[in-house]
């Protein structure tokens, strides 16, 4: 899953935002053969794709670009320039190059256990929001709570019982 040598302009040219792709394999059985819409590009050289209601970050070698007419899907808004924030990508959770702690946690759990883990964190951040004196801290806690839902949706396919 580690991607070391990639060229972002080349990746963006091959898989522009809102272009249509088909997943041709490489490990994610739940989306094998599905068509999706490119929603962005990760800082690790992966292509972010929406397959219906599911989202995945996929190696470019596992994607086949399709003509726009092959799949009718609504356009997605081009993502704002990715800024690593201490809410969504804190440096202290990066274990190895391109591997975050949440990925290891998801791989060690069933989907149900991972759901509970994420729900517990959502509750923790919502319950502690506003308990500190700074308004910025409350906003940050609420953003962290919302981000755990995104993390669950993004990484539940890594769980060892995911199909």
Curated annotation (Swiss-Prot):
<protein>
    <recommendedName>
        <fullName>Gene 1.7 protein</fullName>
    </recommendedName>
</protein>
<dbReference type="InterPro" id="IPR021739">
    <property type="entry name" value="SaV-like"/>
</dbReference>
<comment type="function">
    <text>The function of this late gene protein is unknown.</text>
</comment>
<keyword id="KW-0426">Late protein</keyword>
<dbReference type="Pfam" id="PF11753">
    <property type="entry name" value="DUF3310"/>
</dbReference>
């Amino acid at each position: 899953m580690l991607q070391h040598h990639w060229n972002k302009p080349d990746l963006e040219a091959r898989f522009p935002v809102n272009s249509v792709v088909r997943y041709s394999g490489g490990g994610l059985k739940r989306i094998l053969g599905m068509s999706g819409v490119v929603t962005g590009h990760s800082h690790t050289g992966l292509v972010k794709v929406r397959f219906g209601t599911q989202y995945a970050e996929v190696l470019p070698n596992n994607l086949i670009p399709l003509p726009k007419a092959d799949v009718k899907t609504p356009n997605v808004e081009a993502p704002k320039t990715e800024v690593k924030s201490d809410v969504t990508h804190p440096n202290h959770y990066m274990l190895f190059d391109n591997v975050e702690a949440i990925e290891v946690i998801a791989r060690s759990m069933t989907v149900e256990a991972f759901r509970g883990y994420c729900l517990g964190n959502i509750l923790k951040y919502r319950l502690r929001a506003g308990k500190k004196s700074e308004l910025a801290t409350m906003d940050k806690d609420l953003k962290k709570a919302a981000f755990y839902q995104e993390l669950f949706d993004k990484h539940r396919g890594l769980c060892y019982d995911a199909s």
